[in-house]
UniProtKB/Swiss-Prot annotation:
It comes from the Eukaryota. This is Rhomboid-type serine protease 2. Residues 38-57, 111-112, 169-174 are lumenal. Residues 243-262 are annotated as: Disordered. It comes from Saccharomyces cerevisiae (strain ATCC 204508 / S288c). One of its GO terms (molecular function) is serine-type endopeptidase activity. It is an enzyme of class 3 (hydrolase). Gene3D superfamilies: Rhomboid-like (1.20.1540.10). Interacts with SNX3. The chain crosses the membrane at residues 17-37, 58-78, 90-110, 113-133, 152-168, 175-191. It is found in: Golgi apparatus membrane; Golgi apparatus, cis-Golgi network membrane. Present with 7850 molecules/cell in log phase SD medium.
Length: 262
C-alpha cells in the first residue's frame, strides 16, 4: 500500500473536519477513563423509545478499547478526507450526524425484537457507511474489483459486504448489526444522493454560517484544509477513491481482446 497516498488522499492536505474528528475521538476515549461516557452515550435499542437523542447521535464517538479506536481511525481517514474534499466541511459534518441517526434508528427498531440488551458504540458504523457509499459510486465506473491483484474479482458493489462478514467472523464480539445498518445507510445515500441533499441545509445557509465564523476558520493550522461550501461543486463527476487503473471493459468493440474476469 502507498501510505503517503492514504495519509494524503489525492496528494491534498488533510481535511479540517476529518483531522478534528480523529483528535476528538482520541480525546473522548481518554476522557472516558475519567467520566462515565461509555455508559452515558452507548446506544441501546431502548434509546429510541426513551427518546434519548444524545445516545442516538453521539454513540459513534465512544470507543471501548484502544484497538477499537485505532482500527476505526485508520479505516475512516481516507474515505472521510475524500468525502470532505468533494462535499465541503460543514456538509460533511451534517452527513455524519444524519447517517449516525438513521443507522441508529434502524439498529434500535430491529434490536427491540432481536437484541434488546445489546449496546453499540464506535465510529465503525460511519466507516461502513462510507465504504458502502463509495463502493456504489465506484461500481458505476468499475463493476468488478480484483482481489489483491490476482486474476479473481468480485462485484465492486458487494466488497463492503465481504468485509462485513469477514469482520463478524474474525472479531465475533463486533457489532454486526451496527455495521450492517451503517452499510444500508451508505448504499441508500449513494443510490439516491439527490434525495439525501434535500434534507441537508441549503448551500446558501452553509455559506452564511461560514462567513459568520470566518475568523475561527482562519485559525485552522497551516497544512490542514477547510473546504468552504461556496468552493464545492457536489454535482461534479465521481473520482475513484484509491485506484486509477483502467476499468475492465464491459463489452467487445472488436478492437482488441476483451479482458476476462474470474
Amino acid at each position: 500500500m502507498n501510505w503517503k497516498s492514504y495519509v494524503f488522499p489525492g496528494g491534498h492536505p488533510p481535511a479540517a473536519l476529518t483531522t478534528g474528528l480523529v483528535v476528538f475521538l482520541t480525546a473522548i476515549y481518554l476522557l472516558s477513563f475519567i467520566f462515565a461516557l461509555r455508559e452515558d452515550l452507548s446506544l441501546a435499542p431502548e434509546s429510541l423509545f426513551k427518546l434519548q437523542m444524545s445516545r442516538l447521535s453521539l454513540y459513534p464517538l465512544i470507543h471501548l478499547s484502544l484497538p477499537h479506536l485505532l482500527f476505526n481511525v485508520l479505516a475512516i481517514w481516507a474515505p472521510l478526507n475524500l468525502f470532505e474534499e468533494t462535499h465541503g466541511t460543514v456538509y460533511t459534518g451534517v452527513f455524519l450526524n444524519l447517517s449516525a441517526l438513521f443507522a441508529g434508528i434502524l439498529y434500535c427498531l430491529l434490536g427491540k425484537l432481536l437484541y434488546p440488551e445489546a449496546l453499540v458504540a464506535g465510529a465503525s458504523g460511519w466507516c461502513f457507511t462510507l465504504f458502502a457509499y463509495y463502493s456504489f459510486k465506484e461500481s458505476q465506473i468499475r463493476p468488478r474489483t480484483r482481489i489483491f491483484r490476482t486474476d479473481y474479482s468480485i462485484p465492486t458493489l458487494y466488497t463492503p459486504l465481504v468485509l462485513l462478514v469477514a469482520i463478524a467472523v474474525v472479531i465475533p464480539g463486533s457489532s454486526f448489526w451496527g455495521h450492517f445498518f451503517g452499510l444500508c445507510v451508505g448504499y441508500a445515500i449513494g443510490y439516491k444522493e439527490s434525495w439525501f441533499n434535500k434534507i441537508t441545509p441549503p448551500g446558501w445557509i452553509i455559506t452564511k454560517i461560514e462567513k459568520s465564523l470566518d475568523g475561527l476558520i482562519r485559525l485552522i493550522p497551516w497544512g490542514i484544509k477547510y473546504y468552504r461550501d461556496e468552493d464545492i461543486d457536489r454535482t461534479k463527476d465521481y473520482e475513484p477513491l484509491m485506484s486509477t487503473e483502467t476499468p475492465l471493459p464491459l463489452h467487445n468493440d472488436n478492437s482488441g481482446t476483451v479482458l476476462g474476469t474470474a
